[in-house]
Amino acid sequence: MQVDLLSSAQSAHALHLFHQHSPLVHCMTNDVVQTFTANTLLVLGASPAMVIETEEASQFAAIASALLINVGTLTQLCAQSMCAAVEQAKSSQTPWTLDPVAVGALDYRRRFCLELLSHKPTAIRGNASEIMALAGIANGGRGVDTTDAAANAIPAAQTLARETGAIVVVTGEMDYVTDGHRIIGIHGGDPLMTKVVGTGCALSAVVAACCALPGDTLENVASACHWMKQAGERAVARSEGPGSFVPHFLDALWQLTQEVQA
C-alpha cells in the first residue's frame, strides 16, 4: 500500500485556486460549530451560508458551489432538510460532502448516513471509527471521538471510496485521503486541536469547498487537510491553551492565504 505525500507546491496551488474561486458553501452543519465553521471558510476566502429550513434548503443547494452535510446534532426535521438539499445537489450537479459524526455509536444517524450514500457524495470526511462504521467494517467510537488509529481505517476508506465514488478523508495524527486507488498522507497538526470543538467539522466544510475547485479533486481535498494542520501548528506555537488557540488558528489560516497571494 503506497501512501504519497502532498507537496507544498500542490497545497499552495490549491489555496490559490480556493481564493480565486471563492466557493459559496451551503453548510448544513451542527449547532455547536456553526460560528467556527463560518469563520474558517471566511478567512480562507470562501462564502459560508447556514441555510437549514426545509423550504429553502433545496433552493439554496441549487445555487451553491458546494454543500456540506454534517449530522452532529441530527434531528428528524434536520434530516428532512438535508435529504431535500442532497437530492437537489445531485440534480444540479453540486458537489456535496458528508461528515458522518458519531455514525458508529448511534443507530438512527447510521441508518440516515447509509441512506445518503445512495446519493453519491463527492467526499466523505470522518475520523477512523466513523469511516470504518460507515464502510460496515466495525461499529465503534466514543461518541464523536475515535477509538481507532487513522492508518487502521485506510482499507475501509478505500472500500468506501470505490463503492460510492467519493473521495474519503480519514483524519487523525496523520490524515489520509483516497479515491479508492491513490492515497495521499498529510503530516502535521497538534494534539491541542482535539481540545477545541469544531476543528474536524470546520475541515469538512473546507473539504466541501475544495470539491468545487477545478483540477485534481483528490489533491485539492488533501490540500484542505494540509492547510488546517499547518495553521494548527502555527497557532499552537503562539497559544497558551485551548482558549487562546482559536483566534490564533484563524489568524494562521488568514496568513496562509496572504502568503500565497504575495
From Swiss-Prot:
Pfam families registered for this protein in UniProt: HK
UniProt: substrate binding residues: M50, G198
Record has Oxidoreductase as a keyword: no
Highest taxon in the source lineage: Bacteria
Coiled coil: none
Cofactor(s) required, per the database record: Mg(2+)
Pathway, per record: Cofactor biosynthesis; thiamine diphosphate biosynthesis; 4-methyl-5-(2-phosphoethyl)-thiazole from 5-(2-hydroxyethyl)-4-methylthiazole: step 1/1
Top-level enzyme category: transferase
UniProt record, GO biological process: thiamine biosynthetic process; thiamine diphosphate biosynthetic process
Binding of ATP, residues: R125, T171
Gene Ontology terms, MF aspect: ATP binding; hydroxyethylthiazole kinase activity; magnesium ion binding
Keywords: ATP-binding, Kinase, Magnesium, Metal-binding, Nucleotide-binding, Thiamine biosynthesis, Transferase
Functional description taken from the UniProt entry: Catalyzes the phosphorylation of the hydroxyl group of 4-methyl-5-beta-hydroxyethylthiazole (THZ).
Name of this chain's protein: Hydroxyethylthiazole kinase
Species whose genome carries this gene: Escherichia coli O139:H28 (strain E24377A / ETEC)
